Swiss-Prot record:
Gene3D superfamilies: 2.30.30.140, 6.10.250.910. This is Frd operon uncharacterized protein C. It comes from the Bacteria. Belongs to the HupF/HypC family. One of its GO terms (biological process) is protein maturation.
Amino acid sequence: MCLGIPGQVVEVGKTITENALVDVCGVKREVNIALVCEGEPDTMIGKWVLVHVGFAMSIVNEQEAQETLNALMAMGEVEDDVSAFLYGEESTAKRA
């Protein structure tokens, strides 16, 4: 099963071959946007994408992104693996 985590593109490189910075629950992650970028990379700033293993796999609207994040946060309250992915590896250490 693949799990796509919603994040908002906050910074991009000059070309789509450069990674973008995507905000996932306050954690900035480097993400490759080449699969979803149609045109200039700066048009991606502010868009929500589903991220899987460092790649933006699709563009989603903000409502869908927020609903998915809310569901994942609820899962993270009982599943350390989900929480670690959303908030970074150190989150499980803090909870232990």
